[in-house]
Amino acid sequence: MKIAILSRDGTLYSCKRLREAAIQRGHLVEILDPLSCYMNINPAASSIHYKGRKLPHFDAVIPRIGTAITFYGTAALRQFEMLGSYPLNESVAIARARDKLRSMQLLARQGIDLPVTGIAHSPDDTSDLIDMVGGAPLVVKLVEGTQGIGVVLAETRQAAESVIDAFRGLNAYILVQEYIKEAQGCDIRCLVVGDEVVAAIERRAKEGDFRSNLHRGGAASVASITPQEREIAIKAARTMALDVAGVDILRANRGPLVMEVNASPGLEGIEKTTGIDIAGKMIRWIERHATTEYCLKTGG
């Protein structure tokens, strides 16, 4: 097969591993910067051009689209879909997962347990917003934040009010969430491919922090997950219509709670921690699903 990887930086670990895994299985691979793609949207002869040339047909496309370029990145992916390329995660699913509010609404509607959460835009009644989620301690987030940026633990009501007031000055969407103390600064990242959790790690925040993101200095170890955690991770990925997802789970006294569903999970931390060839599993999923039937279904 001919496979395109959409990424702004082909030197990143995840891109290199996916390219390596695809080549090892006999596929042709090209890494394309989605921002350098430009598109002819024409009912008779749609096409995608890249750095002065018209791109050939790709059997499959692997999107590694960063949050900052979601709009144009998903537009480029959508054009590949229109031309009959199989996407490892469809453009609409990626856009849905990047919208934190919509994601939580969809998960809640499917009965998937979440931390008690409130969301507001520059709330005038800060006190009621805090009461709505059960009071302090609580976590205050900017909806647009990633990798732990724009996330604050407010341990007292006064601190919560101060943080919310500060965020209000940014004219931003504010997410207020109960703090799961018993998780002790840890979460579980489940890597879902299709209908299977192929790997899981426990991420522990560095000392003095409560955010377990590896980008912020957190540590990782292999996690043994329960059948309930496995089920909720797969259900969350399926709810978001993602073939590949990183599902972040908190272990609360009342059971596992989904924190986030990531449409473009990094592979470095979880592959190096578990020793599992996740990139290879993703390529094998493509081999099973980038079929003639898919092209016929999409008009490719």
Swiss-Prot record:
Q: Where does Mg(2+) 2 bind?
A: 260, 262
Task: Show the SUPFAM superfamilies listed in the entry.
Answer: Glutathione synthetase ATP-binding domain-like (SSF56059)
- Where is Mn(2+) 2 bound in this sequence? 260, 262
Instruction: Identify the keywords attached in UniProt to this record, alphabetized.
Output: ATP-binding, Ligase, Magnesium, Manganese, Metal-binding, Nucleotide-binding, Protein biosynthesis
| Pfam families membership | RimK (PF08443), Rimk_N (PF18030)
Q: Where does Mn(2+) 1 bind?
A: 248, 260
Q: Where does ATP bind?
A: 141, 178-179, 187, 211-213
Q: Which residues form the ATP-grasp domain?
A: 104-287
Cofactor(s) needed by this chain:
Mg(2+); Mn(2+)
Metal-binding is among the record's keywords: yes
What GO terms in the biological process aspect are recorded for it?
protein modification process; SOS response; translation
**Under the cellular component aspect of Gene Ontology, which terms does the record hold?**
cytoplasm
In alphabetical order, the GO MF annotations are:
ATP binding; metal ion binding; ribosomal S6-glutamic acid ligase activity
Q: Does the keyword Chaperone apply?
A: no
What start-end ranges are recorded for coiled-coil regions in this protein?
A: none
| Cofactor binding note | Binds 2 magnesium or manganese ions per subunit.
Q: What class of enzyme is it?
A: ligase
Q: What is its EC number?
A: 6.3.2.-
Give the similarity note. Answer: Belongs to the RimK family.
Q: What is this protein's function?
A: An L-glutamate ligase that catalyzes the ATP-dependent post-translational addition of glutamate residues to the C-terminus of ribosomal protein bS6 (RpsF). Is also able to catalyze the synthesis of poly-alpha-glutamate in vitro, via ATP hydrolysis from unprotected glutamate as substrate. The number of glutamate residues added to either RpsF or to poly-alpha-glutamate changes with pH.
Q: What is this protein called?
A: Ribosomal protein bS6--L-glutamate ligase
Organism the protein comes from: Escherichia coli O139:H28 (strain E24377A / ETEC)
